[in-house]
Amino acid sequence: MANSAQARKRARQAVAANAHNSSLRSRLRTAVKAVRKAIDAGDKAAAAEIYKQSQVVIDSIADKKIVHKNKAARHKSRLSAAIKAMAA
C-alpha cells in the first residue's frame, strides 16, 4: 500500500498509464489481425491496402515505446512476407 503522497500519486499515474498502454497494445493486435484476416481471405489487393494502414499504427506504437521497435519490425516483416507469398 502506498503510504506517502508521492507513492499514492505514482500509483494513480501507473493505473492511468497501464490503461492507456493497454488500449494501444490492443490497437496493434487489431491491426495485425486485420491484415491476417485479409491474407486468409485471399484478396491480395485488400491485404496490401490494409497492410499500409497497419504499418502506420505499428510504427506509431513502436515510436511511443509501447512495444519494442524490433517487435514492430518483426510484425511488419512477417506480414509483408505473407502478402508477397500470396502471389506465388
Curated annotation (Swiss-Prot):
Protein name: Small ribosomal subunit protein bS20
Summary of the function given for this chain in its UniProt record: Binds directly to 16S ribosomal RNA.
Family membership: Belongs to the bacterial ribosomal protein bS20 family.
Phylogenetic lineage: Bacteria, Pseudomonadati, Pseudomonadota, Betaproteobacteria, Burkholderiales
Location of region: Disordered: 1-23
GO molecular function, one term: structural constituent of ribosome
GO BP terms in the entry: translation
GO cellular component terms listed in the entry, alphabetical order: cytosol; small ribosomal subunit
Keyword rRNA-binding: yes
Keyword rRNA-binding: yes
Pfam families to which the protein is assigned, alphabetical: Ribosomal_S20p (PF01649)
UniProt keyword list: Ribonucleoprotein, Ribosomal protein, RNA-binding, rRNA-binding
